[in-house]
Amino acid sequence: MPISVDKAVIARLKIQGETFEILVDPYLARDFKEGKNVPIEEILATPYVFKDAHKGDKASEKEMEKIFGTSDPYEVAKIILKKGEVQLTAQQRREMLEEKKRQIATIIHKHAVDPRTGYPHPVDRILRAMEEVGVRVDIFKDAEAQVQDVIKALRRVLPLRIEMKVIAVKIPGEYVGRSYGEVRKFGRIKKEEWGSDGSWMFLIEIPGGVEEEFYEKLNALTKGNAQTKLIERKGL
């Protein structure tokens, strides 16, 4: 169900000396700008394009055709979202910024380790370091796409090494059913084979920061009966 007009915010695009506005759900608009597949109909509070949303002054089909090459309000709305700016409230901007920072810090926690210890830095420590170095985070850009730049900045105050680990695992047949899907969530299966007793043997490549979590999950799934061996550590 689309957001109500009173809770929507304005997305605005100034182009060729003209201004076009739409009323949008701020959070779905953010997701759309990040590149997520969000139907435009769900983002819009109303299926109209305005010259001035506050006054209710709608853009004519002729104006839209001239500037955008189409009079379809949904297609025009997509262009406004992609190229324009979403007018967030101060609270929305603050909430989205904190959420994005935590997403980035969590990714770094999973993929990077402290080279002095081989263990990942806690998320809160990474967040504090981000504040210390004054990392600039883009609310409307996907978290994954910002990680490398953030890591470069953090290395001024926080020792970090991007690391992947390859682990050999053997899971007894009686636990394979419950383990198969869960294990694959951690990383990429590089090689696998099945034993005559139904056991599952495989090599999995996982981010260095989730190694401990991976072992804990395996133990829970197999009641401690999984066999593991660290085969390779790869710094990136």
Curated annotation (Swiss-Prot):
The lineage of its organism: Archaea, Methanobacteriati, Methanobacteriota, Thermococci, Thermococcales. Belongs to the SDO1/SBDS family. InterPro entries: EFG_III/V (IPR035647), Ribosome_mat_SBDS_CS (IPR018023), Ribosome_mat_SBDS_N_sf (IPR036786), Sdo1/SBDS (IPR002140), Sdo1/SBDS-like (IPR039100), SDO1/SBDS_C (IPR046928), SDO1/SBDS_central (IPR018978), Sdo1/SBDS_central_sf (IPR037188). Gene3D superfamilies: 3.30.70.240, Ribosome maturation protein SBDS, N-terminal domain (3.30.1250.10), SBDS protein C-terminal domain, subdomain 1 (1.10.10.900). It comes from Pyrococcus horikoshii (strain ATCC 700860 / DSM 12428 / JCM 9974 / NBRC 100139 / OT-3). PANTHER family: RIBOSOME MATURATION PROTEIN SBDS (PTHR10927), RIBOSOME MATURATION PROTEIN SDO1 HOMOLOG (PTHR10927:SF4). It comes from the Archaea. This is Ribosome maturation protein SDO1 homolog. GO terms for biological process: cytosolic ribosome assembly.
